[in-house]
Regions:
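Mid-chain, well-packed structural core segment of small domains
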Residues: 50-90
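Short, low-complexity, polybasic intrinsically disordered segments
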Residues: 109-123
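Short aromatic/hydrophobic contact patches that present stacked aromatics
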Residues: 1, 59-61, 100
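A short amphipathic beta-strand at an alpha->beta junction
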Residues: 36-37, 90-108
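N-terminal, polar/charged subdomain of small-to-medium soluble alpha/beta proteins
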Residues: 1-29, 33-36, 43-44, 66, ...
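Short edge beta-strands and adjacent turn/loop segments
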Residues: 12, 36-63
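Conserved strand-to-helix beginnings and helix N-cap segments that scaffold or border functional pockets
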Residues: 14-15, 73-74, 114
Length: 123
């Protein structure tokens, strides 16, 4: 879940950010394509640092199932965060911007048939 401050609306290509992070998460090897879900959520109510209205943020919450080792999480986190910061670099160079990321281990209940449909998409 990519949270971002509303003051980035005019300069942040949220759809491209979602695509960048989604593909980086899959490439990290930690998330199977059929299990990956990436979305961006604009935050309208926020305060960053001293409250200057130009201050902005992007915060990535990566929710993962239990059972990954610290090394796996570190490797994947480094890979995903590098992709996110590279994508945001043009904004980072122009304005006050806080970029952060966290992994949250979760227990989930889920059902999907995406693997079935993904197998049909293969050439």
């Amino acid at each position: 879940i990519l949270e971002y401050s509303a003051n980035l609306d005019k300069t942040l290509a949220a759809e491209h950010m979602v695509e960048t992070v989604h593909e980086a998460a899959i490439a990290s090897g930690l998330f199977p394509r059929a299990g990956a879900r990436t979305r961006a959520v604009r935050q309208d109510c926020y305060r960053v640092a001293n409250g200057n209205p130009e201050n902005a943020f992007v915060h990535l919450v990566a929710r993962v199932g239990r059972g990954r080792s610290e090394e796996e999480l570190q490797r994947a986190g480094d890979h995903i965060f590098a992709a996110l910061t590279k994508f945001l670099d043009p904004l980072y160079c122009k304005r006050p911007l806080a970029i952060s990321m966290e992994f949250v281990e979760i227990s989930t209940w889920k059902q999907n048939n995406l693997r079935h449909y993904l197998s049909k998409d293969k050439p």
